[in-house]
Amino acid sequence: MSSITRDSQPALRAGVRLQHDRTRDQWVLLAPERVVELDEIALVVAQRYDGTRSLAQIAQELAAEFDADAADIEADVIELTATLQQKRLLRL
């Protein structure tokens, strides 16, 4: 497994997609034989996993959008990314 840094450029793995589950009224990551529910914060991060933006860039965008501390946002983004990578939902 690749190590995650602020320069990592994650994207959803093949076969994983972001979708709104109408039954649950919840955004989820759908993967073969599993569903991962996303809270509002995880959703705005996951929407930016495009394989071109670094985690530092994603954190800067979110810090500007939500008027929050960039260092705190970056730490949270890296933590979420690590969790999703451990679940094999992302490629770096």
UniProtKB/Swiss-Prot annotation:
<comment type="function">
    <text>Functions as a PqqA binding protein and presents PqqA to PqqE, in the pyrroloquinoline quinone (PQQ) biosynthetic pathway.</text>
</comment>
<keyword id="KW-0884">PQQ biosynthesis</keyword>
<dbReference type="InterPro" id="IPR008792">
    <property type="entry name" value="PQQD"/>
</dbReference>
<dbReference type="Pfam" id="PF05402">
    <property type="entry name" value="PqqD"/>
</dbReference>
<comment type="pathway">
    <text>Cofactor biosynthesis; pyrroloquinoline quinone biosynthesis.</text>
</comment>
<dbReference type="InterPro" id="IPR041881">
    <property type="entry name" value="PqqD_sf"/>
</dbReference>
<protein>
    <recommendedName>
        <fullName>PqqA binding protein</fullName>
    </recommendedName>
</protein>
<comment type="subunit">
    <text>Monomer. Interacts with PqqE.</text>
</comment>
<comment type="similarity">
    <text>Belongs to the PqqD family.</text>
</comment>
<dbReference type="GO" id="GO:0018189">
    <property type="term" value="P:pyrroloquinoline quinone biosynthetic process"/>
</dbReference>
<dbReference type="GO" id="GO:0048038">
    <property type="term" value="F:quinone binding"/>
</dbReference>
<dbReference type="InterPro" id="IPR022479">
    <property type="entry name" value="PqqD_bac"/>
</dbReference>
